[in-house]
Amino acid sequence: MNAPVWWQQLLLAMTGGALGSGLRFAIGASLIQRFGNVFPWGTLTVNLLGSFVAGVLLVWLDARGPSSWPLRALLIVGVIGGLTTFSSLMMECLVFARTDRSTMIGIYLAVTLLAGLALVFAGARTGQWLVTR
C-alpha cells in the first residue's frame, strides 16, 4: 500500500472510530438512564449490535472487491471498532468479581460470546442476501 492510500485509510479509520465511540457513549448512557447500572446493558448491546453489523458489512464489502478498502477502514475498523469494546467487557467482569457477583461473569461472557457469534453469522447471511438482491 502506498503512503497516500495508507494515510487516507488511517484518517478514515480514525474518523469512523470517533463516530463509533460517540455512538457507544450515547447508547451506554441511554441504557444506564433507562435501566440503571446493575448490569452492563450498554456494553452488551453495543457488542451484539456491532457483531451483527460487522457480519453484514464484511460480506457486503467483500463482494465489492478491492475498491471497498476505504469503506472497510471507515466502517469496520473505525465505526464498528469504536462502537464495540472488549476492554469494557473485561473490566465489567472484574467489577462483578469485586462486588461479590462472580456468578454473573460466566453468564455475561456466555451470553456475549454465544449471542455475538450467532449475530455475526446472522449478519453475514443478511449481507449475502443484500449482495444477491
Curated annotation (Swiss-Prot):
Regulation: Na(+) is not transported, but it plays an essential structural role and its presence is essential for fluoride channel function.
Keywords associated with the record: Cell inner membrane, Cell membrane, Ion channel, Ion transport, Membrane, Metal-binding, Sodium, Transmembrane, Transmembrane helix, Transport
Catalyzed reaction equations: fluoride(in) = fluoride(out)
Binding locations of Na(+): 81, 84
Major location category of this protein: membrane
InterPro entries listed in its UniProt record: FluC (IPR003691)
GO molecular function list: fluoride channel activity; metal ion binding
Subcellular locations according to the entry: Cell inner membrane
Protein's membrane topology: Multi-pass membrane protein
TM segment ranges: 12-32, 41-61, 76-96, 104-124
GO BP field: cellular detoxification of fluoride
UniProt-listed Pfam families: CRCB (PF02537)
Gene Ontology cellular component terms for the protein in this record: plasma membrane
Function of the protein: Fluoride-specific ion channel. Important for reducing fluoride concentration in the cell, thus reducing its toxicity.
HAMAP family on file: FluC
NCBIfam families found in the cross-reference section: PRK14218.1 (NF010814)
Full protein name: Fluoride-specific ion channel FluC
Naturally occurring in which organism (per UniProt): Xanthomonas axonopodis pv. citri (strain 306)
